[in-house]
Amino acid sequence: MLLNGPIWILLDSSAFGGIESHVLELAKGLTSHDQLVTVMFLSSYKPEPPLMAQLRDANIKIEVLDQTYTNSSFWLRLKQAITEAKVRPVVIHAHGYKANILLRITRLLAVTDKIKLVCSFHAGETPTGRVRWYDALDRFSAFLTEQRICVSRKIQSKLPCSSQLINNFVPEASLVESTGNNIAFVGRLSEEKGPDVFVSIANQMPETPFHIFGSGKMEPELTKIKSNNVTFHGHQTDMASIWPDIDILLITSRYEGLPMAALEAMSRGIPIISFALGELPSLIDSGRNGWIVDSRQQMIECLRHWRALTHSEKMHIKIQAQQTIEQNYSTQVVIPQMLAMYQR
């Protein structure tokens, strides 16, 4: 059932990561289901966040609050956007701690009557420094929104109030046949993502090419310890042209919810070898569509096992991986669930 009014998606974005990838697919998915969508950015950044260009390419309306409402303070801009809107939104869906907190403050200002307020929790790790306090405020004020969405049971367990578990999702994609034996890491080069684990595995398999797609504060350290078979490709804003060159994806994180990179890979039939993190054991049926392992050594053993398989054996696993996404983690499956949740 369609919603009778606009949906606003609210976030703060300066780079492109898991939240941005999710918001892009959410906006595109809702639009494909004939919903009116505006993605509201809290603040402007230089250079412009990559998500903005991708939304424009998809003909999705965007608005930047600090550009439109220049005379309001940060905490009052969403209130002004609501009160001045020609057509008020029926749903505002926030992503990330800044957007979540702003949405709840706006509710306390008594301007959200008849608007369904929804917040999503994406992060599986516990942040450090000042962000740790914002994260705590985000979680303990979550009751001020009508619906709360988590992408993993572990994230759910950190909330002091009830929430809905809704899978991350990606559009269906064509099966790719890799042109080589390339092993990939896709993500931010930070402690929680475990790129150092990826490099240590690569160092033990010098005959196999390993590729890192991403950037972050650990890059200088990683370049010092890597072997010659590891190539750094830097931050990527669009992996579509990259996936056909990837044979298998390793997820070496220390914390995860349900990473978008895993879904994007499997939607193309690229199997994953991962530690048992977040919802990945629900996504991966070990030995059928990928592998869940307990240690670095098991990850190496799985890689060698994969390389020893025949072409037909590999294709069977690739097809199973792709079908898992189509049946449980695709836009066509999850967007109707999201729309139903908006209307509860």
Model-inferred region functions:
Residues 17-28, 185-204, 212-220, 263:
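A conserved mid-protein helix/loop that constitutes part of the nucleotide-sugar donor-binding site
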Residues 235, 254:
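Aromatic "clamp/platform" in nucleotide-sugar-dependent glycosyltransferases that forms part
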Residues 8-74, 216-218:
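N-terminal strand-loop element at the rim of the active site
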Residues 286-297, 305-311:
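Conserved acidic donor-binding segment of nucleotide-sugar-dependent glycosyltransferases
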Residues 94-102, 121:
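Short His-centered aromatic/hydrophobic patch
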Residues 41, 271-274, 284:
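Short hydrophobic beta-strand element within catalytic cores of glycosyltransferases
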Residues 313-328, 334-339:
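A short, well-ordered alpha-helix in the C-terminal region of glycosyltransferases
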Residues 154, 169:
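Carbohydrate-associated surface elements
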